[in-house]
Amino acid sequence: MPAHVTLSDGTVVTPGVMPDTIPNVGHTVADQLAAMNIQHGIPQMNGWQNITDGSCDAAAHYQCISGYKPRQVPNLTSLAQKFAISDMTFSMADSPSWGGHLYAVMGSLDGFTGDNPNRAKGVPPGRGWGCDSNRVTPWVGPGGHTQLVPSCVPDYSLGLANGGAFRPTPAAYHATIFDELHSAGLSWRIYGATAPMPQFFGGGYDWSICPSLAECLDTSQHNNLVDSSQFFTAANSGKLPAFSIVTAGGSHNAVRESCHNQYSMTACDNYIGKLVSAVEQGPDWSSSAIFITFDDFGGFYDQVPPGLNPDKTQRGPRSPLIVVSPYAKARYTDTTATTFAGILAYTEQNFGLAPLGPNDKGAYPFTDAFNYSQTPLKPVRMVHRALPASAKRIRITPAMENDPS
């Protein structure tokens, strides 16, 4: 974080320190484009005061231009100081959570802008954000025309109407890393929320990835979406699959521990520590690589202009990323630019899988962050802190229920 930030209107802002309750800053596609302020194809990274809902303007005290001190996130700090970090991992697109979860497993947005889905007019609401939601989201066709279509990656081979979407859609089928793993006989799981719950983000079901893919939701693949509590059981018993994704949510209310805006950073840091400890203390530690990251940048300031993906689409702002493994280089900062597609590329190269498309084929796979010849690093002790009073007062408000992120 620089000492001072100059915005496009000439305002100079001194970055602040965030409270434990993460500020509520807009981060829709429109917000991200406003913040990046792309001029002649080059992001200027100085339009943060123009985030569309006013959540980072002068009246909001430029709250998005702020960060956390190491003492506020002791587990993340310990992991970053012991293992490897990437300071050049960009979002694959200027999209919030729904798009971030798509490209995490496809290396593509399949024509979607990535904006979080909204209710379709005249249709009863369904479950979550995906194929069973009866929701719509913007999709850009080959000619550049944007239209609202079901928030579902269809699979027309299933024999279902509309490929599994609730109404006809121009979106095409796109393979996922799950398909590759299955074809290779490799196990995988998504640890998250298996059904909607009466909580923010459906108790995490909105983030569970599988429901947005007809091929996952409507086939036996959906059996690989299990409650997040099962991650701890698998880690403790040495039965983790070859590939795991942990999303915030599930029966133990991990949505409140998600690091999402309006929730407690202490709760999130505690939860990350609990997840990492389960692996570190389990039988699978010696063969594990953990990538800790966030599905988007949350609306918070970043000064580094993102470039383009291999398929020439625009990247979005950076997301923090920590690599935790016995074979991660100790106290190493990986400065090679990449995206979530780099995690796909790492997985594919590790297991000898073919790339899904140009973005993971051309992505940097965190090669320099690992040294498989080194003496394996030992686990780092994680801590659990009491929640501050502000975290105990957090309640679901109408504003949170209607938050498009």
Task: Tell what function each PLM region has.
Residues 1-405:
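N-terminal pro-sequences and low-complexity stem/linker regions of secreted or lumenal proteins
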